[in-house]
Amino acid sequence: DETTAGAYAIASILAKTIFWGTQPISKAMFPLSVENGDNKSQKRNILLNACAFLFVCIFAALVLFYLFPDLLIKIFSGKEIADSSSILVYVGISMALLAFTNLSLLYKVSCGKTKGAALFLVFVLLEVLLLLYFSANIVQFSLALIASSVTFLIGSLLLLRE
């Protein structure tokens, strides 16, 4: 229904700030990794630093989402929306996982590790199926989004491993 869609949209937009806000970290790492060519030690240091910085930013956002969901929803929507508040941290976790997936994929691309990338279509199909099947309510849908994000992260780590 429209009310549920609106509640999800508000939580989703707020949660996407995690993904959008961490993009510069991933994008800054890409040229640095390419620059270091065959120096695996230096590349790994860049990746670890990017992961640590990403973790700190994401952790801070998730703590805010967990502790103050009602306040955040009210600030950004102008009203209290209980359904949005109840899923904000879940959708935030999903976006956090996608931010780490993005970092992993950009790192692999910068290292020239793109073999097997076509298999990611399986993860897109899996996400669609999960979200279609688990759509009875907004919380269930949000948890399915986390599950699909976890599988995408695991896939990005396994399919493009060195």
Annotated model-derived regions:
Residues E35, I93-L119:
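Membrane-interface junctions at transmembrane-helix termini in multi-pass inner-membrane proteins
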Residues I13-K16, M95, F123-E127, I146-L153:
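Residue-level recognition of pore/gate-forming positions within transmembrane alpha-helices
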